[in-house]
Regions:
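Terminal targeting segments of Actinobacterial cell-envelope proteins
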Residues: 1-19
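Alpha-helical segments in soluble extracytoplasmic regions
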Residues: 54-140, 150-185
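Membrane-helix boundary connector in multi-pass membrane proteins
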Residues: 142-146
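Short, functional N-terminal and low-complexity linear motifs
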Residues: 3-6, 38, 132
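Ser/Thr/Pro/Gly-rich low-complexity linker/stalk segments immediately outside membranes or between
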Residues: 38-57
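Hydrophobic membrane-insertion alpha-helices, especially the h-region
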Residues: 21-39
């Protein structure tokens, strides 16, 4: 039996191995610290969550009523089956559905939340909703001209504004206040 051959490393190789081990060890410790912070110490509260639960309950109730009004307007006919005035009729339905949103947003905005965070971010949410409402009105006007294009909405930092609106609504448990999907079908 022959003894194992020992390989002598140069000082440069030893230093290189030591540095590599140090860098890998530091990365492992850093990742471990990040996950411990994320699961143990980081805030679990959403950045959109406001403290005034009475305000959110009131907003949810208003949005729920508006949603019921929109559901009563549903027209499941195909555009091709609706006749020569199909686009004009669809535009009128969109206007009525948008009116329910507009009325709900105006009613919600009549009373401000009582907490500081709510006072700061709810007006931004209302402004975003008003932008979406204007997008819907512009789309209805486009349909009246005979152009049957897909609905497109304003973008905010690369995302549709509806994503921002619906995220705020979901984070505050106001599911009826999410953007309706009636124009995205």
């Amino acid at each position: 039996m022959t003894p194992p051959v020992s390989i002598k490393r140069t000082t440069g190789q030893n230093i290189s191995r030591l540095i590599s081990r140090f860098v890998i060890g530091t990365c492992i410790v850093g990742l471990l610290a990040m996950w411990i912070y994320a699961f143990g110490f980081a805030s679990k509260e959403s950045v959109n969550k406001i403290g005034d639960q009475k305000w959110t309950a009131r907003a949810e109730e208003i949005c729920s009523k508006a949603e019921e009004q929109r559901l009563a307007l549903v027209d499941l006919r195909q555009i091709s089956d609706a006749g020569v005035n199909a686009l004009t009729e669809r535009a009128a339905l969109i206007d009525k559905a948008t009116d329910t949103l507009d009325n709900a947003v105006n009613e919600i905005s009549a009373i401000s939340p009582t907490d500081e965070k709510g006072k700061a971010i709810v007006p931004l949410w209302i402004a975003d909703y008003k932008t979406l409402i204007q997008d819907r009105r512009d789309y209805a006007n486009q349909l009246r001209t005979g152009v049957n294009a897909s609905f497109s909405e304003s973008m905010f930092e690369g995302l549709p504004i509806s994503e921002k609106i619906s995220t705020f609504a979901a984070d505050n448990r106001m599911t009826s206040c999410k953007v309706p999907i009636d124009l995205s079908i």
